[in-house]
Amino acid sequence: VAVKATTTEEETEIPAK
């Protein structure tokens, strides 16, 4: 995963909070 926010590594298209 490129950016790990508060979600799991299954959601890769997430904004960096």
Curated annotation (Swiss-Prot):
Q: Which GO terms describe its molecular function?
A: hydrolase activity, acting on glycosyl bonds
Q: How does activity depend on pH?
A: Optimum pH is 7.5.
Q: What is this protein called?
A: 38 kDa autolysin
Top EC class per UniProt?
hydrolase
Q: Which organism is it from?
A: Mycolicibacterium phlei
Keyword tags? Antimicrobial, Bacteriolytic enzyme, Cell cycle, Cell division, Cell wall biogenesis/degradation, Glycosidase, Hydrolase, Septation
**GO BP, sorted A to Z:** cell wall organization; defense response to bacterium; division septum assembly; killing of cells of another organism
Q: What is its EC number?
A: 3.2.1.-
Q: What is the superkingdom listed in this entry's lineage?
A: Bacteria
Q: How does it assemble?
A: Monomer.
Q: Tell me, in a sentence or two, what this protein's role is.
A: Hydrolyzes the cell walls of mycobacteria. May play an important role in cell wall growth and cell separation.
Post-translational modification as stated in the protein's UniProt record: The N-terminus is blocked.
